[in-house]
A protein has these predicted regions:
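Short, solvent-exposed loop/helix junctions and linker helices
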Residues: 1, 50-53, 91-95, 216-220, ...
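N-terminal auxiliary segments of SAM/dcSAM-dependent transferases
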Residues: 1-74
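Generic hydrophobic alpha-helical segments
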Residues: 11, 100-104, 108, 226, ...
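Short helix-terminating capping/connector loops at secondary-structure junctions
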Residues: 21-22, 112-116, 181, 235-236
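Alpha-helical structural context
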Residues: 31-32, 107, 136, 259
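SAM-dependent Rossmann-like transferase core, predominantly class I methyltransferases
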Residues: 44, 54-138, 142, 147-157, ...
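S-adenosylmethionine
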Residues: 139-282
């Protein structure tokens, strides 16, 4: 029989010895015991139930020995305060993307000041961006597009769990929207942006869908696709918001000037101080 402290210490050391993140095993402990972090801290000297210790040990071994993301083991990731189901069919939502959602909400308040607006999340994956916006702002009517049937199913399940009333289209980037001749006030997207030949963490490369990772030879393929046709699906007064690679600031600025020469736009840094988002406003 082990205490919470002993089990956590073993798991952290086991993870670190294999060059894995020790913080991840705490998430597994919270998941298995259905406890919050502060509850585990309060119970550190208490004995773990045998069944929970066995399950925790099993999951730690899978995480460390087989390099399976903890989010896949738990079946979810927390994003903007809500649980989103994830699988190997979708990109695991990142903390940086929460900042994109927050900045879209701020820009919406500045530009539309509480008006009813139509929003589209292009290439939604798990639905984290679009569904978070729908849940946060009642005046946003949200549509989500996704090319992958498997990813779309995950997003639809998340919408059901969150009781979010949204519309889904399956298709590549803007194509289903163009086919339906739809118009929107806000377009938001976090498309695949890793260049094809770039070396990336094997843990990411081996566990996340390449369809959601790679953005062509220079990582800008999908931004070009979206910006080329964006004016066809947007009302004259609009917001376009992208997440992108930290080193794509100047390339994104050039694309914006090419397709929206009259727009005002700004590149925003994430909490790590990296250029991560470009917000475009047409008024």
């Amino acid at each position: 029989m082990k205490t919470f402290r002993e089990a956590l210490k073993w798991a952290e050391n086991y993870a670190l010895a294999a060059d894995k993140e020790d913080s991840a095993v705490k998430l597994l402990l919270m998941h298995v015991t259905n406890k919050e972090s502060y509850e585990i801290l309060a119970d550190l000297n208490q004995a773990m139930a045998d069944s929970e210790l066995e399950e925790f040990t099993r999951l730690v071994h899978i995480y460390v020995d087989e390099s399976v993301p903890v989010q896949h083991l738990m079946g979810y990731e927390t994003f903007f305060g809500r649980k989103f189901i994830v699988s190997d069919a979708v990109l695991i939502p990142r903390f940086e993307t929460e900042e994109l959602v927050a900045n879209v909400l701020v820009t919406y308040d500045e530009v539309f000041d509480g008006e009813n607006v139509k929003v589209v999340d292009v290439g939604t994956g798990s639905g984290a961006i679009g569904l978070s916006l729908a849940c946060e702002e009642a005046n946003m009517e949200v549509t989500l597009t996704e090319i992958s049937e498997e990813a779309l199913a995950v997003a639809q399940e998340n919408a059901k769990n969150l009781e979010a009333s949204v519309t889904f289209f399956q298709g590549d980037m803007l194509k289903p929207l163009l086919d339906e001749d739809l118009k929107f006030d806000i377009l938001v997207s976090n498309p695949p942006y890793i260049p094809l030949l770039e070396d990336i963490d094997p843990f990411v490369k081996d566990n996340e869908p390449h369809l959601a990772l790679f953005g062509g030879e220079d990582g800008l393929k999908f931004y070009r696709m979206i910006l080329k046709d964006a004016s066809k699906i947007l009302n004259p007064k609009n917001i376009i918001a992208f997440e992108h690679a930290w080193n794509h600031r100047e390339a994104m600025a050039e694309l914006v000037r090419e397709h929206f020469p009259e727009a005002r736009f700004e590149t925003l840094k994430d909490l790590n101080g990296k250029d991560r988002m470009t917000i475009i406003v047409n008024e």
